[in-house]
Amino acid sequence: MLLSLAQWLQSISPEFGSFRVFQYLTFRAVMAALTALLIGLLAGPFVIRRLISLKIGQPIREYAMQTHLSKSGTPTMGGVLILMSIGISTLLWFDLSNRFVWIVLLVTLGFGAIGWADDWRKVVLKDPEGMRSREKYLWQSLIGLVAALYLVFSISESSNLRVLELFFSWVQSGFDVDLPPKAGLLVPFVKEISYPLGVFGFVILTYLVIVGSSNAVNLTDGLDGLAIMPVVMVGSALGVFAYVTGSAVYSKYLFFPHIPGSGELLIFCSAMAGAGLAFLWFNTHPAQVFMGDVGALALGAALGTIAVIVRQEIVLAIMGGIFVVEALSVMMQVIWFKYTKKRYGEGRRLFKMAPLHHHFEKSGWKETQVVVRFWIITMLLCLVGLSTLKLR
């Protein structure tokens, strides 16, 4: 929005030449981060008071960790603050004509709406189960598939009109259209190698990345500050990849696919980092507010969508290793419990408690130890992911 305003002012008078600074992506990225940070810090106390007045407190289940029972009643659905900060900041600083930022915003808000409905049922309607799993996955799948169908053609085209033309030609050809190499699965640490996916392969992979990332972040969000800081780190690293793939010069030099327009995602990533740090101010132990599903599902979906656009799905799994391991721990626990119950008549557990962060708590780690150590691991994994920029 401000970019369009600056361009208009420059067109009517040379006196506004100083507004050329708005054309620099890095300047707008820094301002987006600061704007989101300030919005979050200033609006945070009001949002928390409002949540308390509405009695939107986090219910703690009886089988949860005993040390967590004191958290019962802590305001939840604080993800609204994160989404508000990201949304306002991004709309102010990004190029309004950029389709990639719009699709990320829409996916983020869509998954946020699913999380909001889930939280609302749990907290306000007093339904401990919230949205049923099938209903939640149905809506997640719908949004994920729509986003995947759009992205499969938009990666290789520069306008929405061309995206529609390519889609209809794909349908008319009997669903047989070859995608360019840059739409393939990029293999990290290997120069100029991408695995061709085809339209259906791209759609399936995109769906799995978006929905999987969303639920993985949601499962990780179980301790004060545990999920938000890794989101900030991974989102910031993805912003670097967005900047590289959006630049014809840097992408060629580093042997990355050039995706025109993807650099503008740096604005969204910066806003997400600023909003995340602002939320951490209130979410650090002992937390004054929890993000709830409205925040966790939305942020995870945003990370997944950005990774797909910049063709870094594998690198996302590396940098977001904590999210991956947390999700796998739940899946392994459930599968092993059902298997042993069927075979031995008694369900057995691989972990003392899932997700994995609770296993470490039951092993004697303090909550803050688990959180900070997971942060350190994420920071190291992000450095490994960023090293793929050059180690090819």
From Swiss-Prot:
Keywords assigned by UniProt, alphabetized: Cell cycle, Cell division, Cell inner membrane, Cell membrane, Cell shape, Cell wall biogenesis/degradation, Magnesium, Membrane, Metal-binding, Peptidoglycan synthesis, Transferase, Transmembrane, Transmembrane helix
Family annotation (PROSITE patterns): MRAY_1, MRAY_2
Annotated EC: 2.7.8.13
Gene Ontology cellular-component annotations: plasma membrane
Swiss-Prot/TrEMBL cofactor(s): Mg(2+)
InterPro entries membership: Glycosyl_transferase_4, PNAcMuramoyl-5peptid_Trfase, PNAcMuramoyl-5peptid_Trfase_CS
Location(s) in or outside the cell: Cell inner membrane
An example Gene Ontology biological process: peptidoglycan biosynthetic process
GO MF entry, a single one: phospho-N-acetylmuramoyl-pentapeptide-transferase activity
Enzyme class: transferase
Pfam families reported for this sequence: Glycos_transf_4 (PF00953), MraY_sig1 (PF10555)
Pathway(s) per entry: Cell wall biogenesis; peptidoglycan biosynthesis
TM helices/strands, residue ranges: 29-49, 76-96, 100-120, 137-157, 193-213, 225-245, 262-282, 289-309, 314-334, 369-389
Membrane topology of this protein: Multi-pass membrane protein
Catalytic reaction list: UDP-N-acetyl-alpha-D-muramoyl-L-alanyl-gamma-D-glutamyl-meso-2,6-diaminopimeloyl-D-alanyl-D-alanine + di-trans,octa-cis-undecaprenyl phosphate = di-trans,octa-cis-undecaprenyl diphospho-N-acetyl-alpha-D-muramoyl-L-alanyl-D-glutamyl-meso-2,6-diaminopimeloyl-D-alanyl-D-alanine + UMP
UniProt-listed NCBIfam families: mraY
Family to which the UniProt record says this protein belongs: Belongs to the glycosyltransferase 4 family. MraY subfamily.
Function: Catalyzes the initial step of the lipid cycle reactions in the biosynthesis of the cell wall peptidoglycan: transfers peptidoglycan precursor phospho-MurNAc-pentapeptide from UDP-MurNAc-pentapeptide onto the lipid carrier undecaprenyl phosphate, yielding undecaprenyl-pyrophosphoryl-MurNAc-pentapeptide, known as lipid I.
Descriptive protein name: Phospho-N-acetylmuramoyl-pentapeptide-transferase
